[in-house]
A protein has these predicted regions:
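Gly/Gly-Pro-rich "capping" loops immediately C-terminal to redox-active cysteine motifs
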Residues: 91-98, 102, 112-134, 210-214, ...
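Extracytoplasmic redox metalloprotein regions
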Residues: 45-69, 79-314
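The canonical Cys-X-X-Cys-His
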Residues: 96-108, 211, 317, 340, ...
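Bacterial N-terminal signal peptides
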Residues: 8-16
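Bacterial Sec-dependent N-terminal signal peptides
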Residues: 16-42, 49, 55
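Electrostatic cytochrome c docking/interface patches
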Residues: 53-92, 316-345, 359, 364, ...
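C-terminal capping alpha-helices of c-type cytochrome domains
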Residues: 67, 107-110, 151-188, 307-329, ...
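Bacterial N-terminal signal peptides that target proteins for export
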Residues: 1-8
């Protein structure tokens, strides 16, 4: 399908949303009340919610057939998949990491992982995390692939289970306030095939990303990101960001999504395949092809003669994700928040967590060709440059180096995490676990794990007064 919608350029003025056609002639004008004390995060896709569903609301422009498709995509995202091959919610397994998109991304956020609460693979093996494994030479294990699936349908053996233990180390700020960092140690056990010797194994765990601003990220002006990479060099602070480039659908593209900017799209098709074991037109083979779980699945009645999810359904999920609104900032008139924003700049956090970017004029295109021009021409505030930065390898022995290479990203290089919506994570998902594997239990720990190119900002934060540090955290909570 290749549906093209008439292009509208949205211009946000004080209190008014005006739509113009390509000639600049005004064709629509409607009032959009901006509550006092709020700040727009994503232009016309900003929503004004401060609740457990703040990440899970459609943008204002979603209407008509797109509202219907949004609802359909929302259902496919949230509803529990089954093993039935009946063309509706079926096709799960035989091995999987999550039983729906929403199982790991509750309310389009980050489901609380079991790494802290249950020490690894939790009840029925569910961790709300992805377990990546490679040989130490970078090769994949033929019996497992890139991800260990710790869930399986009834009667089928999972590929393995995850156990995590923690090393704790106490520190102090110069003013005497204590803080603690926790380093995870990951272990795979109950391998379905031959156990892999620890000395030949790299294991990294990724907890879910917030699905905030996905449409804006897909519509972002790629040239602006490349320009940032060209001039993102601040030797006085040890900062030099670079873009990641990857090959998807046979085309070399700028990476934007994922922990290491290792994807050019929202990986809907890959998520159905790798995370849920559901075959589709892009990934028609079972994720456990060649493994014993295929035969076990057949014995349990699983069929392999049809695709488990249609391209139309996957595009509706893509539409849902790209049409979600971005929560407006809160408490922007609070004195502590205002002071905290000053501290954010004083600590040079903005050099990587870039405050303002723009989307390309014509918006984004969904996986099957539907265009979303409403996302075009917007001023957005994601607090990210979407570039790779070396985050260090020396804190507690390993820092944030996970030894996992993705495209041009080395193990110690990570995409700058967008911060929009981060202050609502506790309200939406009930926890404040941050960083790629959830090792940081709060904002302070997340900052203090910064090494490498983040070392200067960490030290500037570290040497602030407690009042200034608290105000910087108050600013982060307003995002």
């Amino acid at each position: 399908m290749n549906q093209t919608i008439k292009f509208l350029l949205f211009v946000v003025t004080l209190g008014t949303l005006t739509a113009c056609d390509e000639t600049g002639d005004q064709i629509v004008a409607e009032e959009m009340t901006i509550p006092k004390g709020y700040a727009l995060s994503a232009g016309t896709s900003t929503v004004f919610f401060n609740s457990a569903v703040a990440y899970d609301q459609p943008a204002k422009w979603v209407s008509g057939v797109y509202d219907t498709r949004f609802t359909r995509g929302d259902q496919l995202y949230d509803n529990v998949k089954t093993i039935n091959n009946n063309g509706h919610m079926g096709g799960l397994g035989p091995v999987y990491a999550g039983y729906s998109c929403g199982s790991c991304h509750r309310n389009a956020g980050r489901t609380e992982p079991t790494l802290w609460t249950q020490g690894g693979s939790g009840t029925y093996g569910f961790t709300s995390a992805l377990i990546y494994v490679t040989r130490k030479n970078g090769a994949f294990f033929p019996d497992y692939g890139r991800v260990i699936h710790d869930n399986a349908i009834y009667g089928v053996q999972p590929e393995g289970k995850l156990r995590v233990t923690w090393d704790f180390q106490k520190f102090q700020f110069p003013d005497g306030e204590a803080y603690e960092l926790a380093k995870p140690n990951f272990e795979i056990y109950e391998w379905y095939a031959d156990s892999i010797a620890p000395e030949d194994l790299f294991c990294t765990v990724r907890i879910p990303l917030r699905h905030v601003g996905m449409g804006q990220i897909m519509a972002i002006d790629r040239h602006e990101i490349e320009q940032l990479a060209a001039r993102s060099n601040y030797p006085e602070y040890g900062i030099s960001g670079k873009a990641n480039y990857i090959v998807e659908r046979g085309v070399r593209q700028l990476g934007l999504s994922g922990n290491k900017a290792q994807h050019a799209d929202l990986t809907v098709e890959l998520g159905f395949s790798s995370d849920m074991g559901m075959t589709n037109s892009r990934y028609p083979e079972e994720i456990s092809e060649g493994q014993l779980q295929i035969n076990q699945g057949s014995m349990m009645g699983l069929l392999y003669d049809q695709l488990d999810v249609s391209t139309e359904d996957m595009e509706n999920v893509d539409l849902y994700m790209q049409s979600l609104g971005v929560p407006a900032r809160r408490n922007v008139n609070d004195a502590h928040v205002i002071r905290g924003e000053q501290m954010f700049y004083q600590a040079k956090c903005h050099l990587c967590h870039v405050t303002t970017l723009h989307t390309q004029p014509r918006g984004s295109t969904l996986l099957a060709g539907t265009e979303l021009p409403w996302l075009g021409g917007q001023v957005i505030h994601p607090y990210s440059d979407f570039l790779l930065h070396d985050m260090g390898s020396e804190i507690m022995g390993v820092g944030l180096n996970d030894n996992y290479v993705s495209g041009l990203a080395r193990g110690n290089e990570w995409r700058t995490t967008p911060l929009w919506g981060v202050g609502l994570q506790q309200k939406v998902n009930g926890h404040t676990y941050f960083l790629h594997d959830g090792r940081a239990r709060n904002f302070v720990e997340a900052i203090m794990w910064h090494g490498g190119e983040g070392e200067a900002s960490k030290n500037l934060f570290k040497n602030m007064s407690k009042t200034d540090r608290d105000d910087l955290i108050a600013f982060l909570k307003s995002l």
